[in-house]
A protein has these predicted regions:
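Conserved catalytic cores of very large enzyme subunits
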Residues: 91-95, 101-490, 507, 511, ...
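Short amphipathic alpha-helical segments with coiled-coil-like heptad repeat character
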Residues: 19-23, 77-80, 302-308, 509-513, ...
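Short, conserved micro-motifs enriched in small and acidic residues
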Residues: 16-17, 491-495
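Long insertion/accessory domains within large nucleic-acid-processing enzymes
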Residues: 670-709
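Contiguous, well-ordered alpha-helical segments that form the cores/surfaces of helical PPI scaffolds
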Residues: 494-507, 527, 684
Length: 709
């Protein structure tokens, strides 16, 4: 400190001038600017500024010192650091403001705020209910940025260093995605809207209660949720037994069995129909349908094996039928997402349930679902266990209860922070030593951001969402009891996401990560990210995991920021999007089987969240080829999807691929229709199915996808 020099603060008070504060501010800006800490330069600038004022200049103000720092950084050829420093000043200035959301909210109302309106393809920003959620999100985001999240993390988010996901929900102590403990809730009862819901006495009631549970769960969190049919299968037996007991008093046992079977199958059909229609028509407090996944699994030799098989078959049959829009025209459904578990008995090698898998293959060609998970690979990666993803792709890590038993349902994800790997590479400018230095600096920042998420949840009372914390969705805590134990010791997860393995490799090596050289580097980076998560887990006891970010709008945001900062670079920033996680670039010519095999090695590292897909043409007349892909998935990759283009033009009745013109506008190739309300365009967006509404970057990515078969 300089004893003879004071500085005038923003509130007009005086404090002792401390050049170390200038030095530390410059070093922090270097971390998010050039990525390399030039300690000598930071020290020199701080000393130069101190000399200016010691030599008789008027008493410095904070603002004047900041202007001098910026000028000195430019003079010292530290342009990127100067930009980062200026960005930090802007964030700090923003944090001192109030009423900063006027423009963004008015932009929602007059439809000019396209970034927010098109951020999520499953949110229709034209609807009042959705607009209300989006407006609340803008206000919440503003408060979080100014009051809750440290300025340097907000700055890193704004600079595209990282992405603090779901910032619009950060001010509430709610979590991301989860596996609903439906077994507990249906068996032991639950409470919905302060009303006791006892264990169902029939399959139909179980299905109705399940949809009510999902709606309540979805409204109390911001991510996806998943259930397994294993938890509703016992209630199909309950219905059969009820009918059998009724009929055996009047008829022979054989006749009673036949009648009970018929009534059970009728109830099966109506129960599944209830789930489908409820989950497709419900709107949660988030302004959208619940992001729900149903896990279709059959436990061979299990007590309810037959019921599970019946439910699987009926679920797929009804999805194949589709629904109708308000005009009575046939359409597909976005939700629920179906994930079908492939095992020895249904992997199309002569198993007893191959007939269901063949039905699933047919459904793929028309409805894009189900997705496929390999029990063979899951058991290899998760100590012999199988369980569904939480929503789209997020996976839990192993955790055992006090009795040494694995527990999956009733667990959740606390939140996600994603790292922009492309910016790390662009900052390093092909200098490999610098790349690893910058990567480690930014991993430290991601860890800090994830700890902010964790700390915002600490101390939350169970009353915040009784259906989650008190009535079985996750736990059965007492009123007022803190949820803290469920945040620690790996019970729930914290996800480190990542974007742009392909572009990162191009920026550093000038080749795709599918080349031998590129693959080696990409895997090295992936393992480095995983090692970081493992280290954080060891140091904190928290459930850090590596997660392949879906990034529906994020990939466009990162690319836009980097293009402004580094310019247009071939195969890196020359498009409107970056590639999700580790995926092969959408324009790269590669065989379906080769693609799945290549990406499978990334699944084995990214165990906190992974999925792969292949793009195929209309396969309705070539089901054996679809079945071949399904069998390949079982043997080679943990989790994968088959993408077709089952679009419909409502004006002329055309079914097939709705095309994109040069202006990124959808049109019917048969009649030229361009009215979005007169067509349904269904595409796999980021694990979930979206229809008609995407941002420009994602639309361009969709348009450039090549076929893999």
């Amino acid at each position: 400190m300089s004893a003879n020099l004071s500085i005038i603060k923003r509130d007009g008070s005086k404090a002792e001038f401390d050049k170390l504060k200038i030095e530390n501010a410059i070093l922090k800006a270097m971390k998010y600017g050039s990525g390399v800490l030039e300690e000598d330069i930071a020290k020199d600038i701080a000393e130069e500024i101190e000399k200016i004022y010691l030599q008789g200049s008027p008493s410095p103000t904070v603002s004047k010192v900041e202007e001098l720092v910026y000028k000195e950084l430019i003079d010292h050829k530290q342009e990127l650091t100067a930009k980062a420093y200026e960005g930090y000043r802007a964030v700090q200035s923003f944090k001192r403001e109030v009423n900063t959301t006027d423009d963004s909210i008015l932009g929602l109302l007059d439809k000019s705020n396209e970034d927010v309106l098109n951020e999520n393809s499953n949110k229709n920003g034209q609807l009042a209910s959705t607009q209300r959620d989006l407006m609340a999100g803008e206000v919440s985001k503003d408060i979080a940025r100014r009051k809750l999240i440290p300025a340097h993390i907000v700055q890193a988010h704004d600079e595209g260093v990282l992405h603090y996901h779901d910032m619009d929900y950060a001010i509430q102590p709610i979590h991301n995605c989860m596996l609903i403990n439906l077994e507990d809730m249906l068996t032991n009862g639950t409470v919905i809207n302060n009303k006791l819901v006892e264990s169902p006495k029939s399959f139909a009631t179980a299905c109705t209660v399940t949809t009510q549970i999902i709606a309540q769960i979805a409204s109390g969190q911001y991510g996806g949720n998943s259930i397994t049919i294993k938890h509703i299968a016992p209630f199909l037996r309950v219905s059969y037994n009820k009918y059998f007991e009724k009929y055996k008093e009047k008829y022979s046992l054989e006749m009673a069995h036949e009648l009970a079977e018929d009534r059970m199958l009728e109830e099966l059909k109506s129960g599944i129909q209830t789930i489908r229609y409820q989950l497709s028509t419900l709107h949660t407090s988030n302004g959208q349908s619940p992001f729900s996944t149903i896990y279709l699994e059959i436990e061979e030799g299990g007590e309810f094996e037959r019921e599970e098989a019946l439910i699987c078959e009926e679920m797929i049959l009804q999805r194949l039928e589709g629904m109708k829009n308000y005009r009575g025209q046939e359409i597909g459904e976005e939700f629920p997402k179906l994930v079908y578990l492939l095992d020895e008995h249904n992997c199309l090698e002569g198993g007893k349930y191959d007939y269901i898998t063949k039905l699933a293959a047919k459904c793929n060609t028309k409805r894009l679902v189900p997705d496929y998970q390999s029990a063979k690979i899951m058991r290899r990666n998760y100590d012999g266990e199988t369980f569904p993803p939480m929503g789209c792709r997020s996976h839990l890590s192993n955790w055992k209860d006090e009795n040494g038993n694995y527990k999956w349902y009733g667990r959740f994800n606390q939140g996600v922070v994603s790292l922009n790997l492309v910016q790390v590479a662009l900052t390093a400018n092909k200098d490999m030593k610098k790349f690893w230095e910058v990567l480690d600096e930014r991993l430290d920042l991601c860890r800090e951001a994830l700890m902010v998420r964790h700390n915002l949840l600490l101390g939350t009372p169970s009353d915040i969402s009784p259906i989650h914390w008190q009535h079985g969705g996750i736990a059965r805590l007492e009123k007022g009891e803190k949820i803290d134990p469920l945040l620690k010791n790996g019970y729930s997860t914290l996800s480190l996401g990542y974007v742009g393995i392909y572009e990162m490799t191009q920026a550093m090596l000038g080749v795709s990560h599918t080349t031998e050289e590129g693959e080696e580097f990409a895997l090295q980076v992936m393992n480095h990210l995983k090692d970081a998560c493992d280290l954080w887990k060891k140091e904190t006891g928290l459930g850090f995991g590596l997660y392949g970010t879906p990034g529906e709008s994020l990939t466009s945001r990162f690319c836009r920021i980097d293009k402004q900062k580094f310019g247009e670079i071939e195969n890196v920033t020359d498009r409107m999007y970056y590639t999700n996680s580790y995926h092969v670039h959408v324009t790269e010519e590669i065989d379906a089987f080769e693609k799945l095999k290549f990406e499978s090695q990334f699944h084995d590292i990214s165990l906190g969240g992974c999925i792969s897909y292949v793009e195929v043409p209309d396969m309705s007349k070539n089901l054996p080829a679809v079945e071949q892909i399904i069998n390949y998935i079982y043997h080679n990759i943990q989790y994968a999807e088959i993408n077709t283009k089952p679009d419909v033009c409502f004006k002329c009745g055309y079914t097939g691929e709705i095309k994109l013109d040069d202006d990124m506008e959808w049109y019917c190739p048969n009649c030229g229709n361009k009215d979005k309300d007169e067509m349904q365009v269904m595409r796999r967006t980021c694990g979930y199915i979206g229809s008609n509404m995407w941002g420009k970057g994602r639309t361009q990515e969709i348009s450039q996808r090549v076929l893999h078969l």
